Amino acid sequence: MILYIAEKASVGRALADVLPGERHREENCIRCGGDVVAWASGHLLELCEPEDYDTKYKAWRLEDLPILPDSWKLREIDRTKKLLHSIRSLLKNASEVVHAGDADREGQLLIDEILEYCGWKGPTKRLRLNDLTPEAIRTALKNMKDNADYAGEYRLTRSEERRVGKECRSRWSPYH
């Protein structure tokens, strides 16, 4: 089974509309013949908070800065756990994944992060959609590349996410 993972439901539905086979809508996916289209809803994972690494970081102290974990941890976002668990379950039966995140660095990060978190090691292709018309989707399906070709985008965006700066949305910033 090929598992297509879109960044959002609207893209998943547009993609399912052009795939061959009879369509069966389920709660968090659409089955198209023998394949499945699933979707995220923005980020399904977030960086763990400093206190998740060590309770001493629960209160900000200048002498503890910078906080640089040996390895960064992710955690599931409560409001999207159901989607993540659905994707994880579908991955168990997948022979291949088609990464259909948005055609930008954040879209690359979003789906790659899910695949890494779920332990997916199988073949993965990258579907870059710039338009959701049926013709544009069919063209993009014919021109997919190996997802490994976009590993640099994933690593760059992941490293930017881990920097502490003005746009930090968590307790990683003392200014939040």
Specify the residue positions occupied by each region the protein language model found.
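Intrinsically disordered, low-complexity regulatory segments
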Residues: M1-E161
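Positively charged, low-complexity/disordered segments
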Residues: G165-H176
